Design a protein with these regions (language model features):
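Membrane-embedded beta-strand positions in outer-membrane beta-barrel channels/transporters
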Residues: 39-41, 146-150, 211-213
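Outer-envelope beta-barrel architecture signal
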Residues: 36, 47-49, 140, 162-166, ...
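Repeated loop/turn-to-beta-strand initiation elements of outer-membrane beta-barrel proteins
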Residues: 48-53, 156-157
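Outer-membrane beta-barrel domain signature, especially the mid-to-C-terminal portions
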Residues: 10, 14-35, 66-70, 109, ...
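Outer-membrane beta-barrel pore domains and translocons
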Residues: 45, 56-58, 171-175, 217
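Membrane-embedded beta-strand positions of outer-membrane beta-barrel proteins
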Residues: 53, 168-170, 214
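Extracytoplasmic gating/loop element in the C-terminal half of outer-membrane beta-barrel translocons
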Residues: 60-162, 167
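C-terminal beta-signal and terminal closure region of outer-membrane beta-barrel proteins
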Residues: 76, 88, 93-100, 105-110, ...
């Protein structure tokens, strides 16, 4: 995909319009493969109660978001509105104190001071004026994948019934994305409801699942 142009490791900004200078030469800007994955599973018990949880961790990997690629250009996400560093609406014309100041340097290495226009679909963050790398995110995450709370009936009750063990459990899955870097969506989301990795378009919000379980042993 397309990348930024760099000077001494800093992203270059066009001083005439405040936008990124795009390096149009196709190059590798990400890798869908994570550096590693891990899980933490633990169970805490007290008398007849047991609380177990599973935390999933992924470190590394990248995902390209077509949702922000087009979304930033259409002005849907929150970061395309609000106030800029001058306290003025981002979407006001630059001549009236609006616009956004992108982090980077001029081609000569001096600090960028030119604000980029955000008043139309042709803004500095959307598909027309930002490189693919701007919409490529770190796919790392930490998730509370599952929590289970179980209660085992005491023997004094079970002895009156034709069972050797009875337990009831409440289960929750995908309860909390503790940490992530991909904006507006689950890092594991793919193309719509599909499971394509490393590419998001029309990503459907992740859902929390709740269940109830009864276990009977004879």
């Amino acid at each position: 995909g397309t990348n930024y142009t760099f000077v001494n490791g800093e992203r270059v900004i066009n001083p005439d319009n405040g936008r990124f200078v795009i390096d149009g030469t196709p190059q590798v800007i990400g890798d869908i493969n994570p550096d590693w994955k891990a899980g933490i599973n633990n169970t805490l018990s007290y008398k007849n109660l047991a609380l177990s949880f599973l935390i999933d961790i992924q470190e590394g990997g990248n995902v390209f978001s077509l949702d922000t690629w087009y979304g930033f250009g259409t002005g849907v996400p929150a970061n395309t509105a609000g106030l800029n560093g001058l306290g003025n609406p981002l979407r006001d014309p630059v001549a009236d104190g609006g616009g956004i100041l992108l982090e980077g340097v001029n081609p000569d290495g001096s600090q960028n001071t030119a604000r980029a226009d955000m008043s139309t679909y042709d803004n500095a963050l959307g598909w027309r004026n930002s490189p693919n790398a701007f919409h490529t995110y770190d796919a790392s995450y930490v998730k509370l994948r599952e929590v289970t709370l179980s209660y085992t009936l005491p023997k004094t009750i079970i002895d009156r019934l034709p069972f050797t063990d009875i337990s009831v459990s409440a289960i929750g899955r995908n309860l909390w994305i503790i940490d992530k870097h991909v904006p507006y969506s689950d890092p594991e989301a793919g193309l719509s409801s599909g499971n394509i990795q490393g590419y998001q378009s029309g990503a459907i919000p992740s859902t929390k699942d709740y269940g109830f379980n009864v276990r009977l042993q004879f």
